[in-house]
Amino acid sequence: LRRPLDAGQRQGALSRLNSEPPALKICLLKTSHRYPFRQPKDVPAPAPAAKFDISLMLYFLFWYVGNAVYNMYNTMALKAVGGKHGGLTMTVSTLQLGVCSLYAALLWLSNFNPITLLGLQKPEKMPLPQTTAADIVDTLPVGFCAAAAHSAGVFCLGADPLFGQIVKAGEPVLSAFVNTVFYGKPPSFAKVVCLFFIVAGVGFASLKKDLKTGVYNLKFDERALIFGMIGNCFAAFKGSENKKLMIKPGLKDRMGGVANQFALTEVLGFLISLPVMLATEWKNLPKFCKLLVSNKDLQIGLVVSGMAFYLYNELATMTIKKTGAVTASVANTAKRVFVLVFMSAVTGKKLTTEQKIGAAIAIAFVMLYSVIDSLVKKFQEKNVK
């Protein structure tokens, strides 16, 4: 009895115990409390049950909805100023960042951020960032790239909301180019293969069949293609510069969190965009002021698109923090499909057969691009075993 028993010995002892007299049973039971039975060492502990993260699901939901709302009200604001030929696209883009900056200022004044309420969580504190002048200078490249990517995106979607979404889905192509040429970080061979299919998908979406001759010709909005590629390029620079920024000693602590970093980037983006707006569209500013006072579509479109842009980007950042970059990248690709279908319904403009096929190819391989390296790694590890 002084030697601890294993599981088999324990079962045998219990069966013998049942056949003993009551007095001996009491003695044996007391002894078993003094010398408890040991569980076999090779029995694994039960795995904890996976918990359903309702807040994460809500963040994803509002991220998608916020992006769709942004696209809808961005289109409304651009139509109110005359569309892509109205001469006020840069003004709309800049004032959207102005709305973002005002909202960021309100968050700092109130010292809390209500975005977590969308995930049924308590609001988090958002104190002013304790950045130095040197930190602001270091953040300027990120702010510039963010401003350029946003403005180019507005020009792209203002030219063609549907084809613009397809072009923006090809962002990994420009990202691979930028990271290879400027940062010495080329993609893997598997990713390079995916890039060819992404380009092919966008190219096929640009084709239109002549009903008389049956010959395919390239037909697309050049403005949407050019500004979409510019936007993708600056988005790639922004991502790489942001990574460089965050490894600077002590900067993350002085920023005070991801929310502060994003807010500061939007404020810098607005301040950088403002002189560009004045230099390029100053002649049309009197016209814009009249429209802003009298046109409700412009008023609502500007405010809602600016707020939606801020909120959905912040939600995207929060999902990356909770899930990791790969999962968020796949979700971002799926979001393209959601927004593409949504904008087709809102604008009443149907996708052509070529656009449907091309978009499906491009988006599918963008999703594969996001996970291909991890899939290859798992396959190699399996073969080694």
Task: Describe these PLM feature segments.
Residues 5-10, 15-385:
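Polytopic endomembrane small-metabolite transporters, centered on the Drug/Metabolite Transporter
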